[in-house]
Amino acid sequence: MAIALEYVREIYYRPLLQLVYEAQTVHRQHHPPGRVQLCALVNIKSGRCPEDCAYCPQSARYSTGIETYPLISLESLRQQAMAAQRAGATRLCMGAAWRSAPAGEAFERVLEMVRLVRKLGMEACVTLGMVSAAQAQQLAAAGLTAYNHNLDTSPAFYPRIITTRTYRDRLETLAHVAAAGLQICCGGIVGLGESDEDRIGLLHVLANLTPPPTSVPINALVPVAGTPLGQLPPPDPLLLVRTIATARLLLPTAQIRLSAGRKNLSESEQALCFLAGANSIFTGERLLTTPNPGQAADAALLEKLGLQPL
């Protein structure tokens, strides 16, 4: 049965401390308390993307000074994956700055990357832009665990952030992923200039995906100079907490991943996010092209909070 927009709105606007308490209660019913999955994100192809996502430094339309490079080698991926695994990561996500996954040799190499990561005993996730039904089937056959394709924001606010790909395009890719039997990894970004109603709209769509996402990355905008949103301030951390808590109540069995923007959060603010139901983080010095707390800082934080890696 579909989850009503008004139901999502009612949850979102609950008093914050009550909302966090309820989210943590539900979290403990479905997940081991005090356990956090560590993930790593490898940028397997950087920059020169033809799209116009207003937040993204990898767009070829903006001058952001990022390092650009073509699809990396299998050996480079192997070294990065093994380093992440030694640091405690059990899931590796591979991101490529494409509008759509390409055909031919590049896609074949991605399939080899998936097989490599799975042979190491890690979960494998990729985010390659839009994929066809046939490509989703090939990724599943290679052993892919999950496909990431974020919705970013509400259907209403979306055209103000991206014009080169429609919301329907994104939902179509998610349908291909689901039809292939892959897990859906899908979330959004807080701090794009959206309203509370836009965050509610995003959560409403996420809660009604069929099947529901098993992984929900909640990102805080990292403003990057040169992008259209580069002058925005980082979002209020309590908006992030409210969004995470609402997501936890709507998607009780999902991994809620506290993703981009952690570098701008204090330890106390990150602790509130965990209390609100986040149970996964990305480790390493960078998330694609933006800074991220390093592994040493994350290890110290988890120890301070009494959290253990899954």
From Swiss-Prot:
For this entry, list what GO says about its biological process: biotin biosynthetic process
| Reactions this protein catalyses | (4R,5S)-dethiobiotin + (sulfur carrier)-SH + 2 reduced [2Fe-2S]-[ferredoxin] + 2 S-adenosyl-L-methionine = (sulfur carrier)-H + biotin + 2 5'-deoxyadenosine + 2 L-methionine + 2 oxidized [2Fe-2S]-[ferredoxin]
Q: Please give the Gene Ontology molecular function terms for this protein.
A: 2 iron, 2 sulfur cluster binding; 4 iron, 4 sulfur cluster binding; biotin synthase activity; iron ion binding
Needed cofactors: [4Fe-4S] cluster; [2Fe-2S] cluster
Checking Pfam families in the record gives:
BATS (PF06968), Radical_SAM (PF04055)
Which EC main class describes this enzyme?
Answer: transferase
Alphabetized UniProt keyword annotations:
2Fe-2S, 4Fe-4S, Biotin biosynthesis, Iron, Iron-sulfur, Metal-binding, S-adenosyl-L-methionine, Transferase
Entry binding sites for [2Fe-2S] cluster: C93, C125, C185, R257
Q: Which CDD domains match?
A: Radical_SAM (cd01335)
What does the note under cofactor report?
A: Binds 1 [4Fe-4S] cluster. The cluster is coordinated with 3 cysteines and an exchangeable S-adenosyl-L-methionine. Binds 1 [2Fe-2S] cluster. The cluster is coordinated with 3 cysteines and 1 arginine.
Its pathway, per UniProt, is: Cofactor biosynthesis; biotin biosynthesis; biotin from 7,8-diaminononanoate: step 2/2
Query: In the UniProt record, does the keyword Metal-binding occur?
Result: yes
Q: Which family does it belong to?
A: Belongs to the radical SAM superfamily. Biotin synthase family.
Among NCBIfam families, the record links this protein to:
bioB (TIGR00433)
Describe its function. Catalyzes the conversion of dethiobiotin (DTB) to biotin by the insertion of a sulfur atom into dethiobiotin via a radical-based mechanism.
- Subunit structure and binding partners: Homodimer.
From the Swiss-Prot or TrEMBL record, give the protein name: Biotin synthase
Q: Which organism is it from?
A: Synechococcus sp. (strain JA-3-3Ab)
